[in-house]
Amino acid sequence: MKKTRLQKVLARAGFGSRRGCEEIISSGKVTVNGEIAKLGCSVDADDEIKLGGKTVEFVDIQTRLFVLNKPAGVICSKKTEGNLKSIYDLLPKIDNEKNLIIVGRLDANSSGLIFFTNDGKLSEFIAHPSNLFDREYLVRARGNFNDEIKENMLTGIKIDSQLLRLSDIIAGDKTSSNRWYTVCLLTGRNREIRKIFESQGLQVSRLKRVRFGPIFLPKGLKEGGWAELKSKDLEKMYSYGK
């Protein structure tokens, strides 16, 4: 059986990012077959792995991560609604495709980068707020924008008992009554960007996610198209999480 780096096994088991798991190993809290593990060691399912005296499950799966360019008018649900198609209709034809997990849902009117994976631990790792995966969007909106509005968006606006804020916003040139913005945020609440803009009198007409953490929407990937990410991209994801 092919051996796997210990930090990868710990990350798959839900003990944090690869970087965080490396620190756990270096602390001397992990044992393999009764001996204190060294950073860089590899293990397989026959090895007894313990963290703080508790057994760590060896998850032996081939992690797959797909990026899909979601079109507007498609919902992130297995069920269709009216004339709206399901994002699952666009999935790659692989074994157990219906068991792929959505990571980074977008509302029906938004488009752009969405992840799918067969690894539940990876999906939890990417989605967990503590790992600080920032998201970048292109937003087209109608209305007047000024420094005061920008400051409001960055410091936070209380909406529906929640403090919503952007981590960055760059305003582009204005064309007629519309303007394009490059927007970043660290959370993924439902319709968060739209709510922030609308609270400041700006009406969003287009919203497209172009980056999630270290992964950009691939150039040339058509709407409705997908691509499987390589192992080096998986390493980027695990290393990116704080």
Located regions from the model:
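Basic, flexible Lys/Arg- and Gly-enriched helix-loop patches that mediate nucleic-acid binding at interfaces
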Residues: M1-K242
